[in-house]
Regions:
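Rossmann-fold dinucleotide-binding core
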Residues: 1-61
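Helical "substrate-binding/catalytic lid" subdomain
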Residues: 28, 48-171
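ATP-dependent carboxylate/acyl-activation modules
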Residues: 34, 175-180
Length: 180
């Protein structure tokens, strides 16, 4: 069954586990999966968990790209990136990138979240291909994947997703990471 929630979620036992199978099979395996996490979901038929994970990661990519774009603008306008993220976290724009990615991995200078650009590219491709198959317009997903591919071209498929921030630093001539 696919999982989502990052390394922090895995350590804390809070990852989302997406199970696609018959309902009676789900009821049998749920107690076993609850040992790993309290967040176990029956998503429908076989394969639905994979579709949901790919869709979730496409949404994560879109939010991450949008967040880096806006924080880059704010930094360019003279606002400290730490202040920008702190305020956004208490406002309607908060998301995984402002909660985890920026403070824990980019603003800290760590630059490691534990999820590669190649894995994100795989999931974004699955979700976008599914959109094509279902004749669903996904313009933000397509644009976000294009920006991800710019990062992959520069840093490779094994690069951490935190490197997407470097693409924005370079494009906007700003710095999100500490100077040290």
């Amino acid at each position: 069954a696919p999982v989502s929630g990052g390394p922090k979620g895995a350590l804390n036992g809070t990852i989302a586990i997406m199970v696609g199978c018959k309902e009676d099979h789900y009821e049998k395996i749920k107690p076993l999966l609850n040992v790993i996490s309290e967040n176990v979901f029956h998503t429908g038929d076989v394969g639905s968990g994979h579709c949901l994970k790919a869709g979730n990661n496409l949404l994560n990519l879109i939010c991450r790209i949008a967040t880096f774009e806006v924080v880059s603008l704010l930094v360019k306008d003279g606002i400290d990136p730490n202040t920008a993220v702190e305020v956004i976290q208490k406002s309607s724009g908060r998301n995984y990138a402002t909660e985890i990615t920026l403070p824990d991995n980019i603003l800290s200078g760590k630059m490691f979240q534990g999820f590669t650009t190649g894995l994100m590219n795989k999931d974004a491709t699955i979700a976008l291909d599914n959109g094509e198959l279902l004749k669903t317009d996904l313009p933000l997903g397509k644009l976000s994947k294009k920006i991800l591919q710019e990062t992959i071209k520069k840093f490779g498929l094994e690069a951490d997703m935190s490197n997407v921030a470097l693409t924005f630093e370079e494009k906007n001539n700003i710095r999100l990471r500490p100077n040290n």
